[in-house]
Amino acid sequence: MDVVQTTKPLFPDTLLHIYCLKGHPPQVSDGPGDFLGTWEEDGYSFLFFLQPRQRFVDTLLETCGELEQTDYLTMTYRQWQGDFVEPLKIGRFVLTPPWLKRVPAGDEIGLRFEPGLVFGNGTHPTTLACLTAIEIVCGGAPITRMLDLGTGSGLLALAAARLGCSRVVAVDNNMLAARTARANVIHNGLEAEILVACGHAQHFVQCSSELLVANIGFRVLAELVAEAGLSAHRWLVLSGLNQVETKALLPLLEDNQILLLKRWQSQEKWNTLLCITQFGR
């Protein structure tokens, strides 16, 4: 487990310098002071800086011969994140960027939230379904301990803490994501409630909790269910699954005496499952 520090603050007009590489470089621990982090997806890596850093990237390419630079982009943070520059209402939750102020009205739950450079601005169907499932679970008997695997920008962990979970562990294997989550924890003053860690889900799944949330994809979920059984947890919210993957996962849940309570399907693709283990019955 790595201790997670925060990312540098970003504002709508912050100019980003983005280098796209084919392949995955080693973790950059001695980059320039304006290095923001690396995001990896589908065999490509995106290195983010606040200044042009072609010389640094060239050195990285020389050191790691299997890497290839495919693009260099500049854009503002507003352009990178699209529309997320104003408060966003999702159910009872109102997500407000740190540079804006908004007082929640009525039963709204306010969260100061910055998606940073990573996936997770709150609008993806799996995120919406997970938020609904967390509200259902936390609306019953009090939930104290929550484990969030694949936390991304930390939104689900923040929501759980605001709904009463006082001991939350949020995990992501991407340091940039973990740093973003840590920054959002600080934005909301929830350092006492939420611990953010950078590591693999398999290393944390045995940490017992009343609520496990894993919006993490089929391969890891299937491995966690098959090898760990998830018996250290009571409620499970499993997401990031397409139809075929869900069909393959359901027998694994049944084999491990995990009962499916509710299933959300959106856009005829994304599935989110609310389950309870034998431990919770």
Enumerate the language-model features and the residues they cover.
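Alpha-helical structural signal in soluble globular domains
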Residues: 45-46, 63, 159, 163, ...
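Short glycine-/acidic-enriched loop or helix-start segments at secondary-structure transitions
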Residues: 57-59, 105, 158, 223-224, ...
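N-terminal auxiliary segments of SAM/dcSAM-dependent transferases
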Residues: 2-104
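S-adenosylmethionine
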Residues: 173-279
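SAM-dependent Rossmann-like transferase core, predominantly class I methyltransferases
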Residues: 81-140
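Conserved SAM/SAH cofactor-binding pocket of Class I
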Residues: 123-201
